[in-house]
Curated annotation (Swiss-Prot):
InterPro entries xref list: 2-oxoA_DH_lipoyl-BS (IPR003016), Biotin_lipoyl (IPR000089), GCV_H (IPR002930), GCV_H/Fam206 (IPR033753), GCV_H_sub (IPR017453), Single_hybrid_motif (IPR011053)
Cofactor: (R)-lipoate
UniProt cross-references to Pfam families, sorted A to Z: GCV_H
Co-factor binding comment: Binds 1 lipoyl cofactor covalently.
CDD domains per UniProt: GCS_H
Protein family per UniProt: Belongs to the GcvH family.
NCBIfam families xrefs: gcvH, PRK01202.1
Name used for this protein in its record: Glycine cleavage system H protein
Subunit and partners: The glycine cleavage system is composed of four proteins: P, T, L and H.
Gene it is expressed from: gcvH
Cellular component GO terms, alphabetical: cytosol; glycine cleavage complex
Length: 127
C-alpha cells in the first residue's frame, strides 16, 4: 500500500481526517479509495451549515467507473467545502491527502479517538 501520512486519522470507510489549528477537521478520501475508484470526474460536496453524524454519507465522488458515498468521520457542522475541486476533481487522484473535500466543526473532538491511525488503517485496507 502507498505511503499513509501518520498525522491523519482514518475511517474504515476510507476517509481521512486532519485536525486543524482552528479546531476544525478537514476530510478527504484515502489514496486506497481513489485508486479503487479510478479517475474522478465529479464531486458532490455537502452544503456549508449542514449538520452531519459520524458515519453519515454527506458527499459523493464519481469516477469513470463508479460513484461512491463519502461519509463524515465525525458528528458536527460542515463549515467549509473545497470549491477548487469542483472544476478539478482529478486533484483528488493526484494528491489525495492534500485535496480535502470538506471541513467539519466537530461536536465532540473525542470522536477522533474512535478513528484508526495509519497502521490500523493499513491493516483494514489490505484485507
Amino acid at each position: 500500500m502507498s505511503n499513509l501520512p501518520a498525522g491523519l486519522k482514518y475511517a474504515k470507510t476510507h476517509e481521512w481526517a486532519r485536525l486543524e489549528a482552528d479546531g476544525t477537521v478537514k476530510v478527504g478520501i484515502s489514496d486506497h479509495a481513489q485508486e479503487a475508484l479510478g479517475d474522478l470526474v465529479y464531486l458532490e460536496l455537502p452544503a456549508v451549515g449542514r449538520r452531519v453524524h459520524a458515519g453519515e454519507a454527506c458527499a459523493v465522488v464519481e469516477s469513470v467507473k463508479a460513484a461512491a458515498d463519502v461519509n463524515s468521520p465525525l458528528s458536527g457542522e460542515i463549515v467549509a467545502r473545497n470549491e477548487a475541486l469542483a472544476d478539478a476533481p482529478e486533484r483528488v487522484n493526484q494528491s489525495p491527502y492534500e485535496a480535502w473535500l470538506f471541513a467539519v466543526r466537530p461536536d465532540d473532538i473525542g470522536e477522533m479517538d474512535q478513528l484508526l491511525d495509519a497502521e490500523g488503517y493499513r491493516t483494514i485496507a489490505e484485507e
